[in-house]
Amino acid sequence: MVLDAVGNPQTILLLGGTSEIGLAICERYLRNARAHIVLADLPGHPGKDRAIAAMTAAGARSVEWIDFDGIDTASHPGVIEAAWGGDTPRDVDVAIVAFGLLGDAEELWQNQRKAVQIAQINYTAAVSVGVLLGEKMRAQGSGRIIAMSSAAGERVRRSNFVYGSTKAGLDGFYLGLGEALREYGVRVLVIRPGQVRTTTTIEHWRATGAKEAPFTVDKEDVAELAVTASTKGKDLVWAPGLFRYVMMVLRHIPRPIFRKLPI
């Protein structure tokens, strides 16, 4: 792990290179020190130029773009190899896994194609890159992985059970990966946010008529929590922190009662 004199990462990889939360986490790291930022997202993504400009404006030492398609798992080894410098190897100090789909909850459980698609991206692709990140960081003997999960995966609800089930799978995988990599000097942080105010979620609320839920946070709040918790070596946090206790209660409500709750 190549850190500067005060422990700041020198190279940060963002899988989901246009993710507003992921970019906010990168920006939070850049407040501490300049770093090389590697953004990986879909070829020709319309948000590419905006993401690169945001990282440059935030003080990145340099910004690199790598084409990354979550569904094309066969291409993932090449993506991760490129992130580690390809023919000129380098360490990646922090890798952020922040790609995913939300989708329309009622459509998802009635549309086989879209249900499979969200499962492939939110879970299968996350496992694919997680294994590869683990291999690389284990070999370098250090590193931090930050995986964006969701409170929706802690206890899957009828209102969004397809999405929630994919996050439950991601959550379990990365918690387990953290245990497996701990002895090799690698730390994995799983973040379980509730609703986060981003362009994507705001558009989703408008399209579906949904309302902002209690405990909704800004992406900057999640970023602050992510950087602080990862630096401290934590393995699991909620955003906001109070959500931990809310979910603790919800997790133990009997199912006949739980299904009647307006959530």
Give the label of every model feature segment.
Residues 190, 210-248:
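C-terminal helical subdomain
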Residues 84, 91, 100-116, 159:
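Conserved mid-core segment of classical short-chain dehydrogenase/reductases
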Residues 130, 166:
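Active-site helix of classical SDR
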Residues 55-74:
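Rossmann-fold cofactor-recognition segment
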Residues 18-19:
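Conserved glycine-rich cofactor-binding loop
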Residues 135, 179-183:
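Alpha-helical segment proximal to the catalytic Tyr-Lys
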